[in-house]
């Protein structure tokens, strides 16, 4: 069976929790007088848990889990939420870390890569019996698969 693509989004550090989708403009009002209609806004949660083909996947930005001090808090959050896969960001550094209970995936960054890594994103495939990740490097000439170097 063909399953549609799944898209999720979470709030990053410094991001507002809501983004207005529209605003009200009064006749002859100045730019600063526009009123945002927050009843029509996107809400960005701190985390999301998606179930894809019976795999619970935790999605979080990673700043609240203090990833620069290690990945232990991400492993703990996965265990706490009964997730076998965690997708996170914050470092803008692509990585695929795992232990016997959980896989941690950082897709890197399309616009602000760090640590000498290429601009990148990841495609996560969740089949019945396994989850696979492919890292895609963005180049001027197109796209290419690559294996990220382990985050140090």
Task: Say what each PLM segment does.
Residues 46, 53, 81-82, 105-152:
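Binuclear metal-dependent phosphoesterase catalytic core
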């Amino acid at each position: 069976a063909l399953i549609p693509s799944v898209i999720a989004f979470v709030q990053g550090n410094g991001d507002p929790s809501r983004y207005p989708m529209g605003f009200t403009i009064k006749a002859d009002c100045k730019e600063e007088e526009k009123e945002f209609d927050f009843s029509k806004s996107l809400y960005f949660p701190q985390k999301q848990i998606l179930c894809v083909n019976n795999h619970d996947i935790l999605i979080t930005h990673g700043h609240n889990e203090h990833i620069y001090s290690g990945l232990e808090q991400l492993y703990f959050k996965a265990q706490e939420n009964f997730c076998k896969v965690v997708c996170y960001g914050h470092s803008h550094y692509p990585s695929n870390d795992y232990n016997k209970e959980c896989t941690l995936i950082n897709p890197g960054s399309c616009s602000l890569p760090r640590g000498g890594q290429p601009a990148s994103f990841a495609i996560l495939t969740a089949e019945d019996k396994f989850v696979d990740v492919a890292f895609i490097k963005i180049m001027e000439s197109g796209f290419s698969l690559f294996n990220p170097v382990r985050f140090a």
